[in-house]
Design a protein with these regions (language model features):
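Short cysteine/histidine-rich metal-coordination sites, predominantly Zn2+-binding motifs
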Residues: 183-190
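Short, well-structured hydrophobic secondary-structure segments
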Residues: 37-80, 86-88
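Short, structured motif recognition centered on aromatic/hydrophobic residues
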Residues: 24-30, 49, 53, 105-109, ...
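Intrinsic, low-complexity N-terminal interaction/targeting segments
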Residues: 1-26, 67-133, 137-140
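Mixed-charge, glycine-accented linear interaction segment located at domain edges/termini
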Residues: 114-181
Length: 190
């Protein structure tokens, strides 16, 4: 079943997580009027998305020098997830596009399906690769937003991702609440 969830343009777009560090679940969420769409994502996807948005907006500014500058400007409370957190699907491939006529960025998320997963040894699709118009299998969502909304999303994702587990000063691995086995200390727990 192919289903496209299209919010053009969004009233708000945000990301967040729930759970304890090391066990967190990440969400991407957008709203247009009464329609709220929540997607389940992986932390690394969110981090790649934040970097991709920043790079993409920088490239747009360089390519279209007549565009007014977009700046990051948000309050943490504006970027909080809304209830209910009922994900439509788990995101597999994420991509970005730009509508020059409307000056809107589009974030496209395709559902992670068995057919969409990378084969062993194969690299997953990157943000800068072309996106198929229709999902090959499963659902897709398109969130159309201003450059400022997307930059705010990228900045907020960076904040959310950085709130994870503290890192060990010796091996730089995450430290769980119960400690961790550090190879630099011959595997002793600390």
């Amino acid at each position: 079943m192919n289903e496209l969830n299209d919010l053009n343009p969004v009233d708000r777009i945000c990301a967040g997580c729930q759970g304890e560090p090391g066990q967190r679940v990440f969400y991407l969420q957008a709203r247009k009027g009464g329609q709220l769409i929540t997607l389940l994502c992986e932390k690394f996807q969110m981090q790649q998305l934040a970097a991709g948005i920043t790079k993409f907006v920088d490239e747009l500014q360089a390519r279209f020098d007549e565009l007014p500058a977009a700046v990051t400007n948000f309050e943490d409370a504006e970027m909080e997830l809304e209830e209910p957190l009922e994900p439509r699907f788990r995101a597999g491939q994420l991509g970005l596009g730009y509508d020059e006529a409307e000056d809107l960025l589009v974030l496209v998320a395709q559902e992670l399906t068995e057919n969409a997963q990378a084969a062993p040894g194969e690299e997953p699709p990157q943000l800068d690769q072309p996106i198929e118009q229709e999902p090959p299998d499963g659902q897709a969502a398109r969130f159309w937003a201003t450059r400022q909304q997307m930059l705010n999303l990228a900045a907020h994702i960076s904040l959310v991702a950085s709130r994870g587990r503290p890192r060990c000063g010796n091996c730089m691995q995450p430290i769980d609440p119960t400690g961790h086995f550090c190879p630099q200390r011959n595997g002793f727990k600390h």
